[in-house]
Amino acid sequence: MFGLIRTTIIALVLAFNAGSILAQDFQKGLVAAQSGDYVTALQEWLPLADQGDVMAQFNLALMYRNGWGVLQDYAEAVKWYRLAAEQGIAEAQSNLGVMYDNGTGVLQDDAEAVKWYRLAAEQGIASAQYNLGVMYDNGTGVLQDYAEAVKWYRLAAEQGIATSQNNIGAMYEKGTGVLQDNVRAHMWYNIAAANGYENSGEWRDQIAAKMTSADISKAQSLARECMSSNYKNCG
């Protein structure tokens, strides 16, 4: 499963707090955190988080999850993630899903992981879309549904997630959740390989051995079109 992504949080922070009357205090914490002064960030954000400031809650969760300026405390991270997630912050929902998925700071619970992944995935978080695809693919915390797995893999793949691109290739190769299609399998393996996913190039070449030259050319053309359109024209 995917881990927690700090860069996403820092980029979104100011947008969420621009209209807050406490934005100045939040900004002090943000500047401190960006310079590595998490002690000051904690001092600025904790009162805001206690008052319900959602991004202060989210960033506190990150600090406790990663041990930035505080003793690492997964249970405390879960507490703050949950508060932010319940206010609809997609990144918090996704990260809370990871905590439940891995049993980190909370009892492991596949159904809860699915619940939070779904909420985040529906808001467009690529890692949550991928993770939800995995849950459907494996029948973990939800009834196994290959077509639903393909749906979520596809959404994550179209955001550039190489693991999802590879997994769609495998689904097309096996005809799992989709009609079997070596051209599409080759296409997605090729895209995943171009994005650095280990073994995708090997699997692409293995399936190419079963294809005609015309089909290989078609798959390569589809891959180029998909990537050049920033995954908007992937067939």
Predicted segment positions?
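Bacterial N-terminal signal peptides
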Residues: 7-17
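Hydrophobic face of amphipathic alpha-helices that form TPR/SEL1-like repeat modules
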Residues: 25-32, 44-48, 59-66, 95-102, ...
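N-terminal leader/linker segments that initiate helical-solenoid repeat arrays
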Residues: 16-44, 55
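Positively charged n-region of N-terminal signal peptides that target proteins for export
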Residues: 1-7
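Short helix-capping/linker turns of helical repeat alpha-solenoids
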Residues: 19, 36-37, 50-53, 66-68, ...
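Terminal, low-structured helical/coil segments at or just beyond the last alpha-helical repeat
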Residues: 198-235
